[in-house]
From Swiss-Prot:
Coiled coil: none annotated. InterPro entries: Rbsml_uS13_C, Ribosomal_uS13, Ribosomal_uS13-like_H2TH, Ribosomal_uS13_bac-type, Ribosomal_uS13_CS. Residues 97-122 are annotated as: Disordered. Located at the top of the head of the 30S subunit, it contacts several helices of the 16S rRNA. In the 70S ribosome it contacts the 23S rRNA (bridge B1a) and protein L5 of the 50S subunit (bridge B1b), connecting the 2 subunits; these bridges are implicated in subunit movement. Contacts the tRNAs in the A and P-sites. Belongs to the universal ribosomal protein uS13 family. HAMAP family: Ribosomal_uS13. The lineage of its organism: Bacteria, Pseudomonadati, Pseudomonadota, Alphaproteobacteria, Hyphomicrobiales. The keyword tRNA-binding applies. One of its GO terms (molecular function) is tRNA binding. Keywords: Ribonucleoprotein, Ribosomal protein, RNA-binding, rRNA-binding, tRNA-binding. This is Small ribosomal subunit protein uS13. Part of the 30S ribosomal subunit. Forms a loose heterodimer with protein S19. Forms two bridges to the 50S subunit in the 70S ribosome. GO terms for cellular component: cytosol; small ribosomal subunit.
Length: 122
């Protein structure tokens, strides 16, 4: 099993698909990395040599922010919005939808399970 960016990627899958197991690398970036390194699209991870895996690892380290660094940056961006006290930060702080969705009837995923209100029986 090849280990890239701290993630064990599956060996029996194609390289483009296996790279998507790394947080921060989707289909577009996976194809970009494979073409930059010069690996064919239909190659599987178990067919790669150690040198090719090292090239992939170096390409990811040089150009992309993945895994822990990316998660840390996203959480710091949200924390910065909350500290500023802007509208988006307030919505994050109250666990409400941030991008203008309606909340009167929907948004159960973001708000959590419905809370019972006393005196609402028929």
């Amino acid at each position: 099993m090849a280990r890239i960016a701290g993630v064990n990627i599956p060996t029996n899958k194609r390289v483009v698909i296996a790279l998507q197991y790394i947080h921060g690398i989707g289909p577009k970036f996976a194809r970009e990395i494979v073409t930059k390194v010069g690996i064919a699209d239909d190659r599987r991870v178990n067919q790669l040599s150690d040198a090719e895996v090292l090239q992939i690892r170096e390409a990811i380290d040089a150009d992309y922010q993945v895994e822990g660094d990316l998660r840390r940056e996203v959480s710091m961006n949200i924390k910065r919005l909350m500290d500023l006290g802007c509208y988006r930060g307030l919505r994050h702080r109250r666990s409400l939808p941030v991008r203008g969705q309606r909340t009167h009837t929907n948004a159960r995923t973001r708000k959590g399970p419905a809370k019972a209100i006393a005196g609402k029986k028929k």
